[in-house]
């Protein structure tokens, strides 16, 4: 069966409360005495009554046709999460007539499209709504229909309302009908454009009760900028949101949008890959964007793992790859901008602050200062030929932390290049200026406003389910989770058009989703539009389940990207926090869409050559032809997969990294004892029996079987793992299965990773195929490091699907409010058609 797809929310004018669990919503209308509306006599007070004559019947029936149809029971129109008992049947209240004005408690007059407080439970803040309908029911009761605003604390960010301005609320599409007497107080809510400059405050917001610049849609917890036409429609029917400064703000946003569209016309974009690993996420994003017609290029990448950086640089020689921490990278970006300002390449209102930056005073005769350095040991004088690099941190762990320049010395080659602190090169201003100007022109480092897309998955060891020592109470205090703060700080500094963050689904589970809520709140604080969802790798053409959390961000001038719907059938597994279950990207249950069959292990790796436990070669040749569409596609070289027409016959299809972790002699002997059949594991070893409750134990009275080394065949850790209930230790995979999740380790001690027919664990290449890496994607480092690179990666087909959605949004091709996007038929194995000049 296919997983369920959630329907987008639509208008619902029933008596049903807001359908999303645990989110603040008005209560059902209270029961009132069933009596017709009477004329108010002098001295008599009623809780609520309508004013003026009713709206003409023809106009009312045209505006609210459902109110005048015969009474019938039908399912609700709006749905955002899984159905509850209250969703089964809802009766639409039939109207006798509609009104434009009402008075409550003989003191407060309300008109259509007014904003108001609505009574809530005792001791709780009142609800906030826009009145979109007022009518007398056929039963004689008085009603109004509310379209609800959400306070920040009522949204997915919850406690991180502290990051949001106090008066800010979010407009939803959720509507329901309540008794008129529940109206409590009239409000002044300003509908304003979402401003990219978070430091700029529109003066009119100081005198209002609340202001609203974003919609909040429950499906996929989407925060989207209010469109200008929406504000105009509201202002036409209301006296609010008409201040001159608000209109000017809207015009400013419009100008930004037009400028963005001119840039988009070139269909080119730059990408920064943070925590890049070996580059899977950016590789997939660029592949998918290209299929949408956008030429997305990974211009910069950062990771602290040297082996991963080498892998990325080899496969993407066009990328500026930096092996450094994200913290140091942020410091470097700030110092680079200062240098650009100092050399008048970039404007700044405080440019005078950088006049003597690092001792590089802007004096003309500074060029006469010697650019030489004397070696104290032998008296040799070195002359700076040119500056060839820049870095921040502690190069080779030898010097103090700071900004360093890489120097090429006159009459020496690059093997003698050295890193020198910039303060020691203050007499080389001319050389530094030359380097900075060349670097600025070529874009060796991104500058604020100069990046189109930032992607990355901040390290998740502190929240991963594979980490048994997680800080459950305050995850942001865990040093392993601090990178989430750094990631958001880099986004805030660079202000890219689009942001895509990836992480494990445990981000939603641990501490009630604390870190995920923080990430959403932080992006909203920066005035990014936001959408989050979960995607399973197997639903996009892999023999691996691998569910991951993704968070989109987009500037107000852009369209927030959608999530791509699955291309392959897949049965979902695992437990998801109830509140986020509806955020899984999937089709509705019972849908009629024809999805491709799910891929199995045999579809993915059956064509690979047999290798032994001791195999160490980095390159080998194929000995079989591919037999499945996946195998044919994954073998394509980069030039073939990119749609290039210039196929070099001299290039051969090479298979990289098809060698397994070389197991020690004891583990190898154990693997050889695992039967070659489905479901086999250590429980098949001699002397192991399964007792009550599926708990394993050793057979009593029998001597334990020993290995050649003298150690026991059945290790104690296998008997005690998960209290003896696990079947994972030394588990053998089978051809008709899918892998739950490719991880960073290859030891078979507590996972099912043994090859179906060979006495070894899955090779690095087999794991890489399960992640969707092309066969020609070469990895670097020791075997364990290669497994880590593959296990930490975002599945390439998932990133490819997201790249297509990104490209569609970037080019302004996304239409409608649906948070989900249908991919083209055959997308999984689709190759782009390049223009002739690029082919």
UniProtKB/Swiss-Prot annotation:
Region annotated Disordered, chain positions: 1-38, 51-86
Consequence of substituting residue 807 to R: Loss of activity
Catalytic activity from the UniProt record: a 2'-deoxycytidine in DNA + S-adenosyl-L-methionine = a 5-methyl-2'-deoxycytidine in DNA + S-adenosyl-L-homocysteine + H(+)
Active-site residues from the entry: 460
Biased composition (Basic residues): 19-30
Subcellular location: Nucleus
Effect recorded for residue 683 to K: Loss of activity
Deleted gene: phenotype: Reduced DNA methylation (e.g. CHG cytosine) at least on FWA, QQS and SDC loci.
Compositional bias segments (type: Basic and acidic residues): 51-70
Effect of residue 465 to D: Loss of activity
Listed name of the protein: DNA (cytosine-5)-methyltransferase CMT3
Native species: Arabidopsis thaliana (Mouse-ear cress)
């Amino acid at each position: 069966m296919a997983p369920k797809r959630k329907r987008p929310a639509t208008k619902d004018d029933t008596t049903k409360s807001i359908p999303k669990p645990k989110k603040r919503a008005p209560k059902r209308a209270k029961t009132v005495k069933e009596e017709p509306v009477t004329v108010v006599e002098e001295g008599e007070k009623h809780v609520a009554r309508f004013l003026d004559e009713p709206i003409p019947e023809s106009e009312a029936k045209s505006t609210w046709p459902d109110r005048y149809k015969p009474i019938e029971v039908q399912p609700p129109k709006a749905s955002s999460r899984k159905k509850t008992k209250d969703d089964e049947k809802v009766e639409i209240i039939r109207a006798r007539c509609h009104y434009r004005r009402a008075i409550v408690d003989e003191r407060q007059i309300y008109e259509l499209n007014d904003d108001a407080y609505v009574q809530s439970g005792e001791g709780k803040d009142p609800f906030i709504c826009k009145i979109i309908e007022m009518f007398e029911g056929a039963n004689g009761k008085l009603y109004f229909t509310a379209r609800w605003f959400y306070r920040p604390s009522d949204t997915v960010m919850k406690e991180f309302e502290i990051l949001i301005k106090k008066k800010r609320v979010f407009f939803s599409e959720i509507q329901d009908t309540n008794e008129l007497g529940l109206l409590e107080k009239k409000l002044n809510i300003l509908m304003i454009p979402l401003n990219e400059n978070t430091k700029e405050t529109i003066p009119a917001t100081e005198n209002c009760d609340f202001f609203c610049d974003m919609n909040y849609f429950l499906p996929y917890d989407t925060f989207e900028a209010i469109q200008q036409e929406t504000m105009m429609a509201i202002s036409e029917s209301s006296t609010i949101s008409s201040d001159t400064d608000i209109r000017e703000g809207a015009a400013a946003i419009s100008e930004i949008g037009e400028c963005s569209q001119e840039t988009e016309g070139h269909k080119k974009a730059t990408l920064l890959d943070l925590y890049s690993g070996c580059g899977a996420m950016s590789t997939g994003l660029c592949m998918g964007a290209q299929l949408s017609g956008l030429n997305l290029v990974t211009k910069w990448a950062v990771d602290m793992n040297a082996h991963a950086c080498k892998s990325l640089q080899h496969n993407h020689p066009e990328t500026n790859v930096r092996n450094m921490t994200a913290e140091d990278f942020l410091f470097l970006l700030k110092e680079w901008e200062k240098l650009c300002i100092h050399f008048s390449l970039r404007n700044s209102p405080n440019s005078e602050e950088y006049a003597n930056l690092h001792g590089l005073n802007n004096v003309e005769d500074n060029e006469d200062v010697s650019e030489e350095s004397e070696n104290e040991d032998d008296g040799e004088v070195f002359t700076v030929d040119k500056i060839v690099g820049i870095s921040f941190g502690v190069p080779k762990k030898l010097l103090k932390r700071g900004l360093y320049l890489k120097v090429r010395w006159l009459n020496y080659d690059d093997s003698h290049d050295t890193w020198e602190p910039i303060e020691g090169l203050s007499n080389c201003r001319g050389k530094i200026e030359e380097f900075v100007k060349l670097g600025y022109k070529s874009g060796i480092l991104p500058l604020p406003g100069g990046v189109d897309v930032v992607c990355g998955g901040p390290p998740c060891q502190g929240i991963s389910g594979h980490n048994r020592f997680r800080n459950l109470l305050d995850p942001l205090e865990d040093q392993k989770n601090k990178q989430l703060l750094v990631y958001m700080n880099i986004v805030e500094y660079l202000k890219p058009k689009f942001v895509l963050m990836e992480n494990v689904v445990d981000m939603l589970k641990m501490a009630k989703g604390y870190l995920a809520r923080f990430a959403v709140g932080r992006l909203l604080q920066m005035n990014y539009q936001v959408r989050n969802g979960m995607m399973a790798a197997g639903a996009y053409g892999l023999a691996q389940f691998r569910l991951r959390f993704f968070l989109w961000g987009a500037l107000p001038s852009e369209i927030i990207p959608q999530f791509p719907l699955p291309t392959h059938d897949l049965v979902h597994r695992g437990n998801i926090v109830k509140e986020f279950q509806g955020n899984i990207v999937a089709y509705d249950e019972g849908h009629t869409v024809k999805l491709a069959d799910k891929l199995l292990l045999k579809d993915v790796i059956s064509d690979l050559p047999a290798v032994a436990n001791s195999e160490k070669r980095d390159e080998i040749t194929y000995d079989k032809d591919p037999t499945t569409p996946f195998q044919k596609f994954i073998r394509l070289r980069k030039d073939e997969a990119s749609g290039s027409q210039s196929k070099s016959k001299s290039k051969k299809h090479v298979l990289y990294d098809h060698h397994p972790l070389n197991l020690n002699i004891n583990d190898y002997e154990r693997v050889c004892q695992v039967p070659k059949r489905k479901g086999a594991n250590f429980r098949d070893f001699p002397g192991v029996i399964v007792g009550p409750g599926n708990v394993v134990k050793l057979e009593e009275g029998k001597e334990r079987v020993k290995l050649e080394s003298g150690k026991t065949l059945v290790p104690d850790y296998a008997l005690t793992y998960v209290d003896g209930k696990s079947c994972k230790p030394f588990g053998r995979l089978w051809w008709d299965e899918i892998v739950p999740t490719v991880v960073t380790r290859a030891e078979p001690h507590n996972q099912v990773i043994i090859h179906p027919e060979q006495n070894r664990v899955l090779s690095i290449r087999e794991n890489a195929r399960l992640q969707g890496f092309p066969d020609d994607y070469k990895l670097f480092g020791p075997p364990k490091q290669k497994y880590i690179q593959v296990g930490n990666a975002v599945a390439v087909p998932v990133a490819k699907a997201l790249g297509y959605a990104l490209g569609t949004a970037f080019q302004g091709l996304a239409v409608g409010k649906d948070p989900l996007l249908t991919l083209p038929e055959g997308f999984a194995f689709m190759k782009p058609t390049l223009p002739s000049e690029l082919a």
